[in-house]
Amino acid sequence: MTITAGIDIGTGAVKTVLFRVEGDKTEWLAKRNDRIRQRDPFKLAEEAYNGLLEEAGLKASDVDYVATTGEGESLAFHTGHFYSMTTHARGAVYLNPEARAVLDIGALHGRAIRNDERGKVETYKMTSQCASGSGQFLENIARYLGIAQDEIGSLSTQADNPEVVSSICAVLAETDVINMVSRGISAPNILKGIHISMAGRLAKLLKSVGARDGVVLCTGGLALDEGLLKTLNESIQEQKMAVVAYNHPDSPYAGAIGAALWGAFRHEKLARLGQQQVAEAA
C-alpha cells in the first residue's frame, strides 16, 4: 500500500490531493483547490498539504511520496516532480477512462495532449499566442464587466448575437471589449464572442496533435466553464473532427491527480527494485 500526495502549483491556483494506492485500487482521501491571488504559492501549497493531512488523519511520515507538477519543482518537501503534460494525461484517464486527448485550459496557456489508454503522452502542443486565449484574460474581462467568474459560462449560453474578439493580443483584445461595452453590446454577447475566439484556437490545437476521434477531456482552471465547453464542441463540429469534448467535476484536479498516481507508480517501482537488489545480494 502506498499513500501519495499530488501538488499542482499553477499560475492561478494550487491543487492538492491525497491518495491511497494498492495495486490497481485507488482511494481518494482528500482534495483542496486554493486560489493563489497575491499569496506565496509555495507557502499556500504547504498550508494546503498540512490541511489535507489533518483532514485525512495522517502525519507527514505516513506519506510515501509527495509528487509535484506545474511550478511545484521548487517546493522544499517534495519527493519528485513530473511534467504537466504527463500528469494531466494520467489524471484525465483516471477521471474518464475513455479520454484519448486532453485540453488543459489554464490561466496563461492552452495545451492539447494526445494520450493512450494508460494516460501515456503520445504528443502535445501548447498555444503560442498571446494570452487572449487564457483563463487570466477571461477573468480580467469578467472583472471589468462586474460579473463573478462562475457566472461566465451561464451568461455566455444566453447570447443571441455574439461579438467575436478578433485580436490575439490580450491588450488589444481588452481594448476591443471596452469598445464593445461603449457600443452597448451585452455581457452575454461579449462573453460568447470571447468563447468563440478561444474555442476556435483550441479546436485547431486539438487537430494539430492528431486528435481525430473519441473523447477529449478538458482540464485546468477553465474546464468547468460550460459556456466554453459548449462553444468548443461547436468549433470541433465546424472543423469536422469526430471528437467530443467533456469535463468532469474534478477536472481542475487532473494535474494533481496525475502527479499523485505517477508518484505511487514510481515509489512502488523503486520498492520492487530495492527488494530485488536485496534478494540478489542474499
UniProtKB/Swiss-Prot annotation:
Pfam families, per this entry?
A: BcrAD_BadFG (PF01869)
Oligomer status and interactors: Heterotetramer composed of A, B, C, and D subunits.
Reaction(s) the record says it catalyses? cyclohexa-1,5-diene-1-carbonyl-CoA + oxidized 2[4Fe-4S]-[ferredoxin] + 2 ADP + 2 phosphate = reduced 2[4Fe-4S]-[ferredoxin] + benzoyl-CoA + 2 ATP + 2 H2O; 3-hydroxybenzoyl-CoA + AH2 + 2 ATP + 2 H2O = 3-hydroxycyclohexa-1,5-diene-1-carbonyl-CoA + A + 2 ADP + 2 phosphate + 2 H(+)
Residues annotated as binding [4Fe-4S] cluster: C130, C169
EC number in record:
1.3.7.8, 1.3.99.n1
Q: How does activity depend on pH?
A: Optimum pH is 7.2-7.5.
Q: Which organism is it from?
A: Thauera aromatica
Q: What is this protein called?
A: Benzoyl-CoA reductase subunit D
